[in-house]
Amino acid sequence: MRRQEALVVTAGTASEASRDGEQPRPAGLVCRARVEPGGPQESRQQWKTFLYCEPHKRIKEVLEEELSIKRDECHVKSPTAVALDGIWSIRRNLPVGGMIPGQQSRNCSLPQTKYYSRHGGLRR
């Protein structure tokens, strides 16, 4: 940190602004910087005032809504169930509907030419 400037942060009010000879401003956070002796601007030790103003109420509401939407998108209640939902399914992986209880053939239990791909489902 350089010794040229020292920052002082205080809670500003309209009365502080009027004491400095400036027009009254709404309450906010005021930062003042002063040049210390020995610096390049040693002769003039003035205070520079910077006023922080909060964003408009509607802008804050919109930002809070966007933040809550992002939180909801990132929050998954059961991540393992969601992850396995697209990968493993009994309907996709096992031929349940093709088996009829009355008909049993010797070739029925042999593997078919179909195979499962997680990118495209069942293929021949």
Swiss-Prot record:
This is Uncharacterized protein C11orf97 homolog. It comes from the Eukaryota. InterPro entries: C11orf97-like. Residues 102-115 have a biased composition (Polar residues). It is found in: Cytoplasm, Cytoskeleton, Cilium basal body. It comes from Rattus norvegicus. Signal peptide: none annotated. The lineage of its organism: Eukaryota, Metazoa, Chordata, Craniata, Vertebrata. Residues 1-26, 100-124 are annotated as: Disordered. Its main location: cytoplasm. GO terms for cellular component: ciliary basal body; ciliary base; cytoplasm.
